[in-house]
């Protein structure tokens, strides 16, 4: 029996090779996984043309995945530098990479990225419209927007972000809102400008059925973008954000009916006390669709440290329903991240994802922590390094500060609690001098 998408296969009770691979990685029964995909609770972004893909699942009961953003811009147009980031991100086990290139002819980079990457690849076709078409935004037609979407799908992109919750009606309300940061979504702002200048409805909304046909043809997962995500904590959970989410829930249902896999994108900047509510609202009104969040950042006053503000919010979000975290780097709000910024962002986001998985009792999550604890008690430094999310920094710290006693560190020396207790339990003398 043939199928068009992973969702179509799941509805037809077919187990695909991608489902088998994801079930193996997640250590769950493949039939349980298929049922979750059939219900729309899990997606496996897997474009038919992404031949190097090692499939991952995103959604209920699975490990929280992380995404790394990169891409070329007008000020930093260097494909080789971005490919170096790609290689490092994959070495650091990032499950997804989004190509957010927004200047010039980006297809060469996209093709190289997809040809190389075993990680799932996402993109925002809206960013590519001006460069690909060589036209000013206001002059781009609905048909041309579709051309760009199809080009990305044909090239092998596994999931695309499209902003179909932003409508003319909401755009009018935005003119009078007391929001501080208005729209911080780049794609959302471009659509807002196009709609206002042309006095027309969002072209991605009016041509949504055509987009669904493209996605079904190539098995592209839709990541329904939140053009009105809060860009500061003051704007969190306001009427515009919730109205857009309601619109996205309806668009998600239409995608599901056409056998197109779908996940929902979320905030953003959210105070700690509102994060759990945001997760529950999305899961409730969007039929438990996988939730993909940017952060969320829990305060606005830490430029240079937003990988930390994001990790705090990301851990809470992951523990209360988020399935997919978009990384944030120390360079957020300041510049295009360099390689070191990217590494710090990945590590911080992986910590948040793992902390959330422990709280969600994802199989295997706490077990790794228990192994680390046993290694610490045994003062087994090599095992500790092996189990660490990042092994480079602990190895560096250990090497730079060698203790006199090998079975301790320079913090406590002979007064190491683990060392003392082990000696007592083993019947050995405890000599501190």
Curated annotation (Swiss-Prot):
Binding sites annotated in the UniProt record for Zn(2+): 269, 333
Binding annotation for substrate: 69, 98, 127, 163, 185-187, 226-229, 265, 292
Pfam families referenced in this protein's UniProt entry, alphabetically: ThiC_Rad_SAM
The entry's keywords: 4Fe-4S, Iron, Iron-sulfur, Lyase, Metal-binding, S-adenosyl-L-methionine, Thiamine biosynthesis, Zinc
Listed GO MF terms: 4 iron, 4 sulfur cluster binding; carbon-carbon lyase activity; zinc ion binding
BP-aspect Gene Ontology terms: thiamine biosynthetic process; thiamine diphosphate biosynthetic process
Pathway(s) the chain acts in: Cofactor biosynthesis; thiamine diphosphate biosynthesis
Names of required cofactors: [4Fe-4S] cluster
Enzyme Commission numbers on file: 4.1.99.17
Keyword NAD part of the UniProt annotation: no
Residues annotated as binding [4Fe-4S] cluster: 409, 412, 416
Reaction(s) this enzyme catalyzes, per UniProt: 5-amino-1-(5-phospho-beta-D-ribosyl)imidazole + S-adenosyl-L-methionine = 4-amino-2-methyl-5-(phosphooxymethyl)pyrimidine + CO + 5'-deoxyadenosine + formate + L-methionine + 3 H(+)
Cofactor note: Binds 1 [4Fe-4S] cluster per subunit. The cluster is coordinated with 3 cysteines and an exchangeable S-adenosyl-L-methionine.
One of the record's GO cellular component terms: cytosol
Protein's UniProt keywords contain Aminoacyl-tRNA synthetase: no
PANTHER family from the UniProt entry: PHOSPHOMETHYLPYRIMIDINE SYNTHASE, CHLOROPLASTIC (PTHR30557:SF1), THIAMINE BIOSYNTHESIS PROTEIN THIC (PTHR30557)
Function of the molecule: Catalyzes the synthesis of the hydroxymethylpyrimidine phosphate (HMP-P) moiety of thiamine from aminoimidazole ribotide (AIR) in a radical S-adenosyl-L-methionine (SAM)-dependent reaction.
Similarity field: Belongs to the ThiC family.
Protein name in the entry: Phosphomethylpyrimidine synthase
Annotated organism of origin: Finegoldia magna (strain ATCC 29328 / DSM 20472 / WAL 2508) (Peptostreptococcus magnus)
Gene that specifies this protein: thiC
């Amino acid at each position: 029996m043939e199928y068009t998408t992973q969702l179509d296969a799941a509805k037809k009770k077919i187990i695909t090779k991608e489902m088998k691979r994801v079930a193996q990685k997640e250590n769950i029964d493949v039939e349980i996984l298929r049922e979750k995909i059939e219900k729309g609770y899990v997606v496996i972004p897997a474009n038919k043309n992404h031949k190097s893909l090692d499939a991952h699942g995103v959604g209920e009961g699975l490990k929280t995945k992380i995404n790394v953003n990169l891409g070329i811009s007008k000020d930093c147009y260097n494909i080789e530098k971005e490919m170096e980031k790609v290689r490092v991100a994959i070495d650091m086990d990032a499950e997804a990479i989004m190509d957010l290139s927004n200047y010039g002819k980006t297809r060469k980079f996209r093709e190289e990225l997809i040809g190389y990457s075993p990680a799932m690849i996402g993109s925002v076709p809206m960013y590519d419209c001006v460069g690909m078409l060589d036209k000013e935004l206001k002059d781009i037609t609905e048909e041309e927007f579709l051309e760009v979407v199809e080009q990305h799908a044909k090239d092998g992109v596994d999931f695309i972000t499209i902003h179909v919750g932003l409508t003319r009606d909401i755009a009018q309300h935005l003119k009078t809102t007391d929001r501080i940061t208005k729209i911080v979504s780049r794609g959302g702002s471009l659509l807002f400008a196009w709609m206002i200048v042309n006095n027309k409805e969002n072209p991605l909304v009016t041509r949504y059925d055509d987009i669904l046909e493209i996605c079904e043809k190539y098995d592209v997962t839709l990541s329904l973008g939140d053009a009105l995500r809060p860009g500061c904590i003051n704007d969190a959970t306001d009427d515009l954000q919730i109205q857009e989410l309601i619109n996205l829930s309806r668009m998600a249902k239409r995608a599901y009916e056409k056998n197109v896999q779908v996940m929902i994108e979320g905030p953003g900047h959210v105070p700690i006390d509102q994060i759990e509510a945001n997760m529950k609202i999305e899961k409730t009104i969007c039929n438990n669709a996988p939730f993909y969040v940017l952060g969320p950042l829990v305060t606005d006053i830490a430029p240079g440290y937003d990988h930390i503000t994001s990790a705090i919010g990301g851990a809470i979000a992951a523990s209360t329903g988020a399935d997919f975290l978009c990384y944030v780097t120390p360079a957020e709000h300041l510049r295009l991240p360099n390689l070191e910024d990217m590494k710090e962002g990945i590590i911080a986001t992986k910590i948040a994802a793992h902390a959330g998985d422990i709280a969600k009792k994802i199989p295997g999550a706490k077990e790794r922590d228990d192994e680390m604890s046993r290694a610490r008690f045994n003062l087994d430094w090599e095992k500790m390094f092996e189990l660490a999310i990042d092994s480079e920094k602990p190895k560096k710290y250990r090497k730079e500060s060698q203790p006199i006693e090998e079975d301790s560190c320079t913090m406590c020396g002979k007064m190491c609690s683990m060392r003392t207790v082990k000696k007592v339990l083993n019947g050995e003398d405890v000599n501190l001098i």
